[in-house]
Curated annotation (Swiss-Prot):
Record-linked Pfam families: TatC
Transmembrane stretches, start-end: 41-61, 64-84, 91-111, 125-145, 146-166, 172-192, 204-224, 232-252
Provenance organism: Porphyra purpurea (Red seaweed)
UniProt keywords, alphabetically: Chloroplast, Membrane, Plastid, Transmembrane, Transmembrane helix
GO BP terms, alphabetized: intracellular protein transmembrane transport; protein transport by the Tat complex
Assigned protein family: Belongs to the TatC family.
Protein name: Uncharacterized tatC-like protein ycf43
Annotated localization: Plastid, Chloroplast membrane
Top-level division of the source organism's lineage: Eukaryota
């Protein structure tokens, strides 16, 4: 009987054992569910604390969000509009503050079950997604929001006086920040497609004509305002993010 199949089997076992995480302790389904429940409770408590703190500091947060709207007077058009808008803003701030902590809990939950090779891929992607979302929000606040507001304020300023609803303005700002943060996740999606072998970097580069059209559509859909300036800036950012993802995949040889 040939020993070659047995040697191949032993080699595969040794290779797989090297990829397994250290101190891997088996857990029952009940233990997994209990750990998941505990981490979910931790995230929920953290969210409540973050939202509560945000509500107590709502005046400072409102002033920060109002900063891009220079020279605009905000009106309360309905009873309790400011109060209910403050609750909404506090909830959104709580979600944003909780997201990194939630991702951290997800990492702690899935980490013991990952091989060393999977850890090298998944952990940077999770951390990178948080960083890119935050960068997208900062880009929206310092670039997109001022550009959109300046256009909307200056257009027809000699005819009508800009008096804006407090609630509608903050819906506009929050939607702009959130949608831009999502748009900045494009390189993460490209990395997942490239690493999984679904689409290569060369194929992504060859599709540049279609990407220009798609980026224009994304810029029109994700920007809550209809002004061309904001849409052009958003489309340009989407293109830059896309080609950045292609360059990263080329560097990774995917």
């Amino acid at each position: 009987m040939s020993l070659e199949p047995q040697n191949n089997l032993l080699a595969n076992i040794n290779t797989n054992s090297e990829n397994l995480p250290e101190n891997d302790v088996p857990m029952s389904i009940t233990e997994h569910l209990e750990e998941l429940r505990q981490r979910t409770v931790f995230v929920f408590i953290f969210f409540l604390l973050a939202a509560t703190i945000s509500f107590t500091q709502i005046k400072i947060i409102v002033e920060i969000f109002q900063a891009p709207a220079i020279g605009i007077k905000f009106l309360q058009l309905a009873p309790g509009e400011y109060f209910f808008s403050s609750i909404k803003i506090a909830i959104y701030c709580g979600i944003v503050a909780t997201t990194p902590f939630g991702v951290y809990q997800v990492i702690l939950y899935i980490l013991p079950g990952l091989t060393n090779k999977e850890r090298k891929v998944i952990l940077p992607i999770l951390i990178g997604s948080i960083v890119l979302f935050i960068v997208g929000g900062i880009f929206a606040y310092f670039v997109l929001a001022p550009a959109a507001l300046n256009f909307l304020i200056s257009y027809g300023a000699d005819i009508v006086e800009p008096l804006w609803s407090f609630e509608q303005y903050f819906d506009f700002i929050l939607l702009l920040l959130f949608s831009t943060g999502l748009a900045f996740e494009i390189p993460i999606i490209q990395l997942l497609l490239g690493i999984s072998g679904t689409v290569s970097a060369s194929q992504m580069l060859l599709a540049w004509r279609y990407i220009i059209i798609i980026s224009t559509i994304i810029g029109a859909v994700l920007t809550p305002s209809t002004d061309p300036v904001t849409q052009i800036i958003m489309s340009s950012a989407v293109l830059a993010l896309y080609f950045s993802g292609v360059i990263i995949l080329f560097l990774l040889r995917k």
